[in-house]
């Protein structure tokens, strides 16, 4: 035992920072995903595989894809900037945060209005396979998801401020919307309509946004960062250039969710709901297994890059990536065997039948195949982000989306919702191969590759 402790103590401090951060994120993710799983159990109990769940899944995916995409881009390009600003601090950092929060808040309001007014066209174009009742329900749910578009942007900035300081409590607060929805669904007098899903979602995201803002201010010594609509910070050109390039790839990848919803909607027979249950179970494994390491790695790798030690950052990322591939392969084997049991334990009660369990487990198994490649690629994404290699990242993302779009049209008609999951798995095979090939190159990255 003492020998093991000594061996662990000899691990490089940067590896220890990633491990400790990943452990904290994994614990928070486990708690958060547990809350999410309980919420899904409650939804399955009250609604089963029904029109209400179809509407909820469709509206949540379509209504949040753009703000989630923007937050994803900002997180990747913001954290290295915030890590560097942490070394300087003072008025320069405060000005940047105030301006950032001002423009993000303005963009959030604009995005909420855009979501509201564009929704009829979204449903008309992408929800052609939905019944009239489901379409009407999506309109009701928009009362929640239009404001949520703005709240997601504001919360994303607060989360990035926390992550830049290697504080990962924001991961735990990702569960707040699920907890609020759970409470509304279980306390509702009946499961008629989508009211409990609507109000639980809206209140949950509002609480999460305020809570994250308070934690970010406390982490910055009480600095809230009153919004300011100016562009005087010298960091804007760097940030906007990187964000513009990243947004191209991220928008392409963000269409994967709506693309899946479109394919499932055209399959009919509540395929949206079946795919949604399987996807949310899969997200539990993806989150705990890979997101924990990815979120912990970016600020550490950015700090190593800021010190000028590019070779160490590359070596660290490759070691962690291969370790995560092995862990993902083990998760596939275990998950394939336990899929029917897991779906049954979580969902099979109330309106959710044994037939529903078999359908969701079948789809889930095909989705499990993505685990090794998703696990492995996420740490390599953080490496390239810390090196500002955004053009390469954008190109890989566009290639991923192109492959996914082709495979959906080929596999979904033949395999149903399982084909949609298999297409996602093959997409991540391509992604991992591309990122590994780029990461293996020993050439020094350019300033803005």
Describe the role of every protein-language-model region.
Residues 117, 130-158, 184, 352-380:
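Alpha-helical transmembrane segments of multi-pass membrane proteins
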Residues 173-219, 399-403, 417-441:
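Hydrophobic alpha-helical transmembrane segments
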Residues 111-132, 332-354:
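Short membrane-interface helical motifs at transmembrane helix boundaries
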Residues 72-88, 291-309, 381:
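Helix-loop junctions and terminal segments of transmembrane helices
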Residues 23-28, 147, 158-185, 369, ...:
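Alpha-helical transmembrane segments of multi-pass membrane transporters/permeases
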Residues 44-64, 136, 238, 242, ...:
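Interfacial/gating helices of multi-pass transporter permease domains
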Residues 2-18, 22, 213-253, 441-449:
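Interhelical loop/hinge segments that connect adjacent transmembrane helices in multipass membrane
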Residues 19-23, 57, 61, 78, ...:
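Interfacial transmembrane-helix starts/ends
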